[in-house]
Amino acid sequence: MGSEGNMKKSVVTQVSIGGFGESTTAKQLTDYLEDEVGIVWRCRLKTSWTPPGSYPNFEIADTSNIPSIDEYKKVEPHAFVHFAVFESAGRAMDAAGQCNLILDGQPLKVSLGPKNPYSLNQRRRTTVPYKLAGITLEIGTLVSRDDFFVSWRAEGVDFLVDPFDNTCKFCFRKSTAFSFKDAVMHAVINCDYKLELLVRDIQTVRQYKTLHGFVLILQLASSPRVWYRTADDDIYDTVPGDLLDDDDPWIRTTDFTQVGAIGRCHSYRVLISPRYENKLRTALDYFRMRRVQEERVRWPPRIRNEPCFGEPVSDHFFCIHHKEGISFEIMFLVNSVLHRGVFNQFQLTERFFDLLRNQPKDVNIASLKHLCTYKRPVFDAYKRLKLVQEWIQKNPKLLGSHEQSEDISEIRRLVITPTRAYCLPPEVELSNRVLRRYKAVAERFLRVTFMDESMQTINSNVLSYFVAPIVKDLTSSSFSQKTYVFKRVKSILTDGFKLCGRKYSFLAFSANQLRDRSAWFFAEDGKTRVSDIKTWMGKFKDKNVAKCAARMGLCFSSTYATVDVMPHEVDTEVPDIERNGYVFSDGIGTITPDLADEVMEKLKLDVHYSPCAYQIRYAGFKGVVARWPSKSDGIRLALRDSMKKFFSKHTILEICSWTRFQPGFLNRQIITLLSVLGVPDEIFWDMQESMLYKLNRILDDTDVAFEVLTASCAEQGNTAAIMLSAGFKPKTEPHLRGMLSSVRIAQLWGLREKSRIFVTSGRWLMGCLDEAGILEHGQCFIQVSKPSIENCFSKHGSRFKETKTDLEVVKGYVAIAKNPCLHPGDVRILEAVDVPQLHHMYDCLIFPQKGDRPHTNEASGSDLDGDLYFVAWDQKLIPPNRKSYPAMHYDAAEEKSLGRAVNHQDIIDFFARNLANEQLGTICNAHVVHADRSEYGAMDEECLLLAELAATAVDFPKTGKIVSMPFHLKPKLYPDFMGKEDYQTYKSNKILGRLYRRVKEVYDEDAEASSEESTDPSAIPYDAVLEIPGFEDLIPEAWGHKCLYDGQLIGLLGQYKVQKEEEIVTGHIWSMPKYTSKKQGELKERLKHSYNSLKKEFRKVFEETIPDHENLSEEEKNILYEKKASAWYHVTYHPEWVKKSLELQDPDESSHAAMLSFAWIAADYLARIKIRSREMGSIDSAKPVDSLAKFLAQRL
């Protein structure tokens, strides 16, 4: 889709025209314009629109017999005109401006159409869609391989397969009733409808021939997008061929079929006339080129109308709500299996539900969770459920469960799209204050996320639309109108919904959830109501809705509960440091060393020294507390007024995050800014080349692999690093090879998708304040830790507690930035200095409290309440003049006060308004495009304007101030490096384009090869060295734990559609399908957290108390732990147990890979055993990779 060659200038070939009389035809207008202005290719004249304040009413199927009105506000006649050459559009605009365009005595108004790159116009004209007109479309369900149930049918549909934008469209016309608020009558208007899907959303295509023509059956991964616009246009074309669409908006809507066919059915049967045979063949060739899977049809399926064909459904979501004798937990999982497409609704008979009624709850939960991991449809639900239940009963080890930490909760999720909803299997997540308090009813909480079809981010264009610019000019109507999708969302928020026998009501949301378009709902019971929960949370006195909502959301921040700190131990009156209207201490307080150590103990952190700062929630306070020497006055926590957000009596200190080693990576925004500030392109190129060289050597050179793991993977690389250092080799140890391969491909993915280049002399650091007041303006203090895997063995007894505290004080110029950073002034150049009084602070960025303006505020308008900053002290990344560009002014938007207390409906309205107006992602993407296309880069005027808009958008959750994206700044073309496959792209010649193309081919080849690579389970090597005498006694217990662990891990792989376990265990995830979400980062973080919780849970199981442990010496304990680790290894790697493990993965499938990560939960003890078996002569003490072996060998 990229246009190679030079970028052609953007041109306007379209205009919108109004002011002519109602009797004017498209041909008359065309003839006049060709005489006065220039050749016209197409003229589309409109006299209809969606009446303001109305919505399509799809409950009315037959519009011929309803009372209709014609007295709604009509639109002035207007036309959309495409000229042959762009000069004609300019001439028309000029002539109208001078009142020289007069038709039938009436002066015409002209509005310029969209500005499009010349190459885009040309490509649209030369890329011909494969149009199969007059087809019959049947939307239904492939109930079995031989039966197709039709839910909805339409004739005279046009089917377009369009390589221009890689879409398929079903287009047809339909009379539609529009309803008005508080009105009985309806307006009846003809509308054009469009069902649009991306070619990549077609899972399979089947094709066969009948006596009447050809048939395609398209199996979709998700529902198509539904659009409409008013029809009966008078169209006059003077040339054949396709043109770019004009300004007349297509409006998103919901499922218009009364039977809910678009939402619940993903099989589309297309009946095509024999005269389109050649076009059909070409379209199928295009599908093959796009790698759509083609399935052979041995014989055509039987076609029948579904039971209850044509009967309206009132269900918002297409769920099976309640069955007598079946609990909510089971019904939710049944719907999860149904929504995943494993079973279809016609298979869920009473026989199926009787199977569930006749088995214990734990068997049913395990069975349905297992079925949720299936990737393909199953056509006999009863038979498969029975098979899985029997298999689980034969293997009771799959049923056990471990008590979860109080910081972990099992969360149910519901995803709501414009046409349907999806129940997602419960996920283990970090808990929050509310869930911990209401633990007894925790399963009545539901996380609801609003998304577009294909699990894409729902954006403002789905929820609202503007009329065409010419209509604005003619009617002075510049308002945006809400779509029917918005009405659906708003009714769900306001009225709640029923699900599996429960009624759910809106509760609240955190700041992260607001960005994620999600919120908490709660199903009230007789004892606990939504109002009770909100009363317990605290007193929220803000009269600004945005601020009040944000503060309620603090109770839903994901946190660890640690120490109960009594009010008399907390100073809440510490004054803020204020100057020139700025708060230099905004969001930061202090914590005493003894309390900081207590918190670390509660968190059970695997670190050798206490974090020096924590991001916290305490009562109604939020922010960061930095470790600072105690004043011996009994005060353990000092909190400033800027940290106080609401009143609460809650006294548990809750932790969101803490300072730790976090490797530094560049990204596209930072590269764009550093480049415009004068850092040469060759610097970024050389840094990427160095990274590529190491990644290409990672599987063959243990020294390089060890360096990559310890320097760029943080704690997620520890297991693989320990294995390398102990002497395990990637060539003979498949799990180690898999982990290294995942790190390599995921980092290549980061380079391709985000230009995520590793910076050796760089970190991501939490911002803190110089409480001592020593640093001057323009200075900072940075002390960073270096990774040391020896510290992973500190629990192995006193001989191993000698920790390496390897700290480095950074000196010299540093560049800092915080995401998002769009303005050149967002990169601050500071001088890092050594201050002995601050040596107790490490892995954080200490800012001065002196100066006219806080450096935090200069950097993207940030503060000190937990923001992370990219910091680089590699002098090659410092701009040549060693100075900061003038910072943008980040003045807080004026707050709107209601003049009264904020109520529940205000919060709902605010959430809905955010959904309809969220623009930050759009603005940031537009900034990338304009910076790439302009010779001035990020200093281009349009980029500076976008930076201002982004700053306002970032603050929307706090201020409620809406930002709108100017139409002229919306990109029409995207640079190739943005990977916008579904849009028009061009080849970028700037540094980001060069970096992208350098790595793209490497990544594509490696990802494909890695997808196909698998270890033959029968060829997994077994290392007998790891057998410790007496391990046999622990095998039964080890096997039970492995069954449970593997079951949960396989569930995560299936739920997130990730291919390999090594991706999850290293946190380097690369195989998640693109259609899952545009915001893959958020999904990956959730997956990482789910796995970390799982790993922590089983590490706790591993370390569970040994009998008579109090009477055992450290060495005796270690020997017992080594036996346990040996048993865990044996049930994972021994051929006999590998075979058993594969049998447990699925009762009747044999295509799975052996799961190996369970053994390495005890990697530290397996490393001890391995190192003892090595000859000391083979350990090179000078090599970093052998440092651990030497360290342990001296102590074992």
Curated annotation (Swiss-Prot):
Effect caused by changing G825E: Alters post-transcriptional gene silencing
Alphabetized GO MF terms: DNA-directed DNA polymerase activity; RNA binding; RNA-directed RNA polymerase activity
Effect of S860F: Alters post-transcriptional gene silencing
GO annotations of cellular component type: cytoplasmic ribonucleoprotein granule; nucleus
Keyword Nucleus in record: yes
Pfam families from the UniProt entry: RBD_RDR6, RDR6_2nd, RdRP
EC number: 2.7.7.48
Cellular compartments annotated: Cytoplasmic granule; Nucleus
Consequences of knocking out this gene: First leaves are elongated and curl downward. Presence of stigmatic tissue in the middle of the septum at the apical end of the carpels. Altered post-transcriptional gene silencing (PTGS). Accumulation of ARF4 mRNA (targeted by TAS3-derived siRNAs). Upon infection, over-accumulation of CMV RNA and enhanced susceptibility to cucumber mosaic virus (CMV). Reduced levels of TMV-cg-derived small RNAs.
Swiss-Prot/TrEMBL keywords: DNA-directed DNA polymerase, Nucleotidyltransferase, Nucleus, Plant defense, RNA-binding, RNA-directed RNA polymerase, RNA-mediated gene silencing, Transferase
InterPro entries: RBD_domain_sf, RNA-dep_RNA_pol_euk-typ
General function of this protein: RNA-dependent RNA polymerase involved in post-transcriptional gene silencing (PTGS). Possesses ssRNA and ssDNA-dependent polymerase activity, but does not have priming activity. Possesses in vitro 3' nucleotidyltransferase activity in the presence of UTP as single nucleotide. Required for the production of 21 nucleotide trans-acting small interfering RNAs (ta-siRNAs) derived from TAS1, TAS2 and TAS3 endogenous transcripts. Acts in the RDR6/SGS3/DCL4/AGO7 ta-siRNA pathway involved in leaf developmental timing.
Family label: Belongs to the RdRP family.
Subunit relationships: Interacts with SGS3.
UniProt-recorded name of the protein: RNA-dependent RNA polymerase 6
Protein encoded by which gene: RDR6
